[in-house]
Amino acid sequence: MLMPKRTKFRRQMRGRMKGKAKGGKEIAFGEFGLQALEPAWINSRQIEAARIALTRYIKRGGKVWVKIFPDKPVTQKPAETRMGGGKGSPEFWAAVVKPGRILFEVAGVPKETAREAMRLASHKLPIKTKFVEREEMGGDANES
């Protein structure tokens, strides 16, 4: 599973997930992508489950890029523990995802295969997503 090799501090504040994604909104490597429509924490197990669903459906044909990384430690205190006694121990790692963020990218497969693979992967995630295609840059259409 994905997690940082080392961090400066073991615990982090929860923070707020307001606004839209600042970066990672365009497809950078592949031809098709899966875009988040809601804010959420996506933990490393969910990312891995979605990645496996994608790669199993695509088989050997295409290439998959995971565009998010779980770099936020999420702490939990043990069950039935009294309040106080400090912050809990880190239990899992999460990626902070805001609306508009590209989560996965795929290349080297037909559009329908990519769409179905992304649909299967989206069922493993706790947020609503949409299938997006790369928009080609360049002004070919307006040349006279």
From Swiss-Prot:
> What biological-process terms (Gene Ontology) are attached?
translation
What GO cellular-component annotations does this UniProt entry give?
cytosolic large ribosomal subunit
**Keyword field:** Ribonucleoprotein, Ribosomal protein, RNA-binding, rRNA-binding, tRNA-binding
- Pfam families, per database record: Ribosomal_L16
- How is this protein organized at the quaternary level? Part of the 50S ribosomal subunit.
Q: Which HAMAP family match?
A: Ribosomal_uL16
Q: What is this protein called?
A: Large ribosomal subunit protein uL16
Output the lineage of the source organism. Bacteria, Bacillati, Bacillota, Clostridia, Natranaerobiales
